[in-house]
């Protein structure tokens, strides 16, 4: 893969559609017009209608053509965009012509070039990928903020502060007779202030990452209490087998759902009971594992046994506030009805009649509002960011007042490097490959 190549790709999903967009980027991007039989000059930043031809001068399609000369384009290179009809035949014929001169882009290569040409940093690039992959409104809001530079500005501010502190310290090291010794006190004070800012940022309860991936909700209970029925209802499709025979569900099933604009991963689990069946026991172990790691637990109990539930025994290790209690199969319940049993609030739910389901969904949304970022929050969104920021915080926390100035300077260089890895001010090819390979081909 050479940066000198001119590349092209379909930037819209493959398939029949009203419009398809083909993007060409590189030094020779404008040659795509000559290649496709367009003889008139194409004006920059003006949408023009052109007929595109194959090498035999047979018309392929009429296209809206846009030309963005570099560096004032997304990639920082000359870019041509062809908006054509979303016909598989049109796309295939245009690809056949373009491929005689240009190379098909690798996944994420347009965004990679934008990064390498200084148009975006790595946090913005990752925000763009998250924006493309967002499925709920809350995910979209977070991804848009990141792609707009919220994280970039914060992390660059920290990195710049470290560079300034390091500059003052190195001036003291190189010219001790000309620089006041008070500079050392100032260095340590500023380092501690920056460390406090880093720690506050890291102490976010992983809310940004949870929003990016979805809040995990485990549906738990004994066999035949309606777990799979509720799971299918929340998933809006029949994913789990529903049977009157206990032990039907023996594995973990997952469904990504949007509840009130927030992303959830709803998990169906095996009924928890004593069993001699090896496969069922494995399913029960997985159910207990989900119970231990889920962000939210929905614990189902049959409405018919409301007088003798054994709530406290049902949750191994005690209740940690993550559990929503449900009396299932409550066909005669009233909408929104709840009941206090053994000191716990229970939602009465009947999937069969749909009673109580809205109240349960509202309870899940309330948990999401508490567990996800608030509007305007600037939070860590990936483990890659968190790892480098934790490393920077650890290095800074190891600095002591008694350390020689030269050692402090080395620690500050390491911390600066770690924060630079988040934004891409410091990077290696392996980091870039790992980030951009997750992008779609046309982005």
UniProtKB/Swiss-Prot annotation:
Name the needed cofactors. K(+)
Select a single GO molecular function from the record's annotations and give it. Answer: GTPase activity
**Out of the domains of life, which is the source?**
Bacteria
Q: Which GO terms describe its biological process?
A: tRNA methylation; tRNA wobble uridine modification
- InterPro entries listed in its UniProt record: G_TrmE (IPR031168), GTP-bd (IPR006073), GTP-bd_TrmE_N (IPR018948), GTPase_MnmE (IPR004520), MnmE_dom2 (IPR027368), MnmE_helical (IPR025867), P-loop_NTPase (IPR027417), Small_GTP-bd (IPR005225)
Give disulfide pairs as residue numbers.
none
Q: Where does GTP bind?
A: 224-229, 243-249, 268-271
Enzyme Commission code: 3.6.-.-
Binding-site list for Mg(2+):
228, 249
How is the co-factor bound, per the entry? Binds 1 potassium ion per subunit.
Residues noted as binding (6S)-5-formyl-5,6,7,8-tetrahydrofolate in the record, renumbered to the chain: 23, 81, 119, 443
What is an example of a Pfam family matching this protein? MMR_HSR1
- Asked if the Swiss-Prot or TrEMBL record annotates the protein with the keyword GTP-binding, the reply is yes
Where does the UniProt annotation place the signal sequence? none
UniProt keywords (A-Z) are:
Cytoplasm, GTP-binding, Hydrolase, Magnesium, Metal-binding, Nucleotide-binding, Potassium, tRNA processing
Entry GO terms, CC: cytoplasm
Q: Where in the cell is it found?
A: Cytoplasm
What's the main place this protein lives?
cytoplasm
Query: Which protein family is named in the record?
Result: Belongs to the TRAFAC class TrmE-Era-EngA-EngB-Septin-like GTPase superfamily. TrmE GTPase family.
Q: How does it assemble?
A: Homodimer. Heterotetramer of two MnmE and two MnmG subunits.
Query: What job does the chain carry out?
Result: Exhibits a very high intrinsic GTPase hydrolysis rate. Involved in the addition of a carboxymethylaminomethyl (cmnm) group at the wobble position (U34) of certain tRNAs, forming tRNA-cmnm(5)s(2)U34.
Q: What is this protein identified as?
A: tRNA modification GTPase MnmE
Q: Which gene encodes it?
A: mnmE
